[in-house]
């Protein structure tokens, strides 16, 4: 049987909004060689970094920006400011034909005057990576793109993302916009934890809207051996090819971030390499708190009917 390293999980859970530092393991495990500008492999349960390269390097996130766009929308839903069933009237600023910056970019293909639910716009943002869907949501939630970007950056601070600043709601190249593999892993962890009603959308393989069917660009969703259920791809000329993939193996979830790969296939291969390595070399185990009761067991023919179970409290 192959030896594994164990990631300790305390019963005293830490907040997902905390920033976690990379950890050195006491046992030498050779990480895979990754062909990308930067990368991170994170254990979801603990937030522990299993391997990383240039993880704090500020890079263009491209459409990985949309993870924060979706996160802000979900926070607005959680605070009851909007609902998934709200109907949004699409404005001209979300129309690709009227916005040259959208030429050649990913779209949901909205038109001015379209009436679309927040739920469908969220699906268009996640599955189609629709820049127009991002603008429509930003207008509805915050009254405009600049106001929405301000909200995005407020959550950057709340999540302690030290390497991140946003200038757009969609991720197209813009001066001053940057993030890191580490920060995007932390954001992905927050999304998985905090958006149970939305996260299933990240595994949706296609979306048909207005008679147009588009495939999710995350090719790992089709790999039946990996159990990948999200999260997002991104690409611009300045960013290269980015991918965040999360996979579940038994009770363990891993998050792989790859930034600046050289092709769509390359980003998938590098993310898969990280996930396979983590699954083969690590297990997550729970460390019980000293003196903490974790259950009871019935006793037959004893002087007590049951006994409490848990670690023995030690001293010194």
Please give the residue ranges for each predicted region.
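Glycine-centered loop/turn positions within well-structured domains
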Residues: 3-4, 48, 132, 314-315
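Bacterial N-terminal signal peptides
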Residues: 8-17
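A generic structural signal for short, solvent-exposed coil/turn residues
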Residues: 13, 31-33, 80-82, 102, ...
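Short linear motifs centered on Gly/Pro in flexible linkers and helix caps
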Residues: 19-20, 223
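Active-site-adjacent loops and short helices of periplasmic peptidoglycan-processing enzymes
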Residues: 21-182, 188-193
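Domain-terminus/edge residues, biased toward the C-terminal soluble/receptor-binding domains
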Residues: 161-165, 173-316
């Amino acid at each position: 049987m192959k030896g594994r390293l164990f990631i300790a999980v305390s019963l005293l859970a830490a907040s997902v909004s905390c920033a976690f530092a990379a950890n050195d393991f006491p046992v030498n495990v050779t990480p895979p060689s990754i062909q990308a500008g930067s990368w991170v492999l994170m254990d979801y349960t603990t937030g522990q970094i299993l391997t990383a390269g240039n993880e704090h390097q500020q890079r263009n996130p491209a459409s990985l920006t949309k993870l924060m766009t979706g996160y802000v929308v979900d926070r607005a839903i959680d605070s009851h400011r909007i609902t998934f069933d709200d109907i949004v009237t699409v404005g001209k600023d979300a129309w690709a034909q009227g916005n040259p910056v959208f030429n050649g970019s990913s779209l949901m293909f909205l038109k001015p005057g379209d009436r679309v639910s927040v739920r469908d716009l969220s699906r268009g943002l996640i599955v189609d990576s629709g820049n127009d869907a991002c603008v429509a949501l930003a207008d509805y939630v915050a009254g405009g793109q600049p106001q929405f970007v301000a909200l995005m950056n407020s959550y950057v601070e709340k999540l302690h993302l030290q390497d991140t600043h946003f200038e757009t709601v969609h991720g197209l190249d813009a001066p001053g916009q940057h993030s890191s593999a580490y920060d995007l892993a932390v954001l992905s962890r927050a999304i998985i934890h905090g958006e149970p009603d939305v996260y299933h959308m990240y595994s949706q393989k296609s979306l048909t809207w207005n008679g147009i069917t588009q495939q999710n660009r995350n090719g790992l969703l089709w790999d039946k051996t990996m159990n990948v259920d999200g999260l997002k791809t991104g690409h611009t000329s300045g960013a290269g090819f980015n991918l965040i993939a999360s996979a579940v193996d038994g009770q363990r979830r891993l998050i792989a971030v790859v930034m600046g790969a050289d092709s769509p296939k390359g980003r998938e291969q590098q993310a898969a390499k990280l996930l396979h390595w983590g699954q083969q070399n690590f297990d997550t185990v729970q460390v019980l708190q000293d003196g903490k009761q974790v259950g009871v067991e019935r006793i037959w023919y004893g002087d007590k009917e049951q006994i409490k179970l848990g670690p023995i409290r030690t001293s010194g």
